[in-house]
């Protein structure tokens, strides 16, 4: 059976603090990644330098920079139009997420196991170096389009 292809999309804005760690965690996935597409929203820190460094080393990383700041929602909306038409799944990444190596493999396995799944997500585990709280099941299950938006 042929493996499903996965593209990762990430939007950035002044994300240099955790960006290297996140890029490394995506590259360390045990499941193959078809492409990584990053769209920067006019960062003023070293984000673009880091992204260009990774794109030079790994040709399947495509980096785009907006000509004007669009904001998070519009940036994510637009990035989906840059994904290759040949991929089966799109994984959404934030610039400060650090993924476990098996994340994509487990999500693909789950979505393939259950007929009719169109969306799959995972909880977060916070770290002492991050200010976020750990969340559990933040969407009611089963959820509907109305509960998502």
Question: Residue locations for each model-derived region?
Answer:
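Nucleotide-sugar donor-binding/catalytic module of glycosyltransferases
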Residues: 1-149
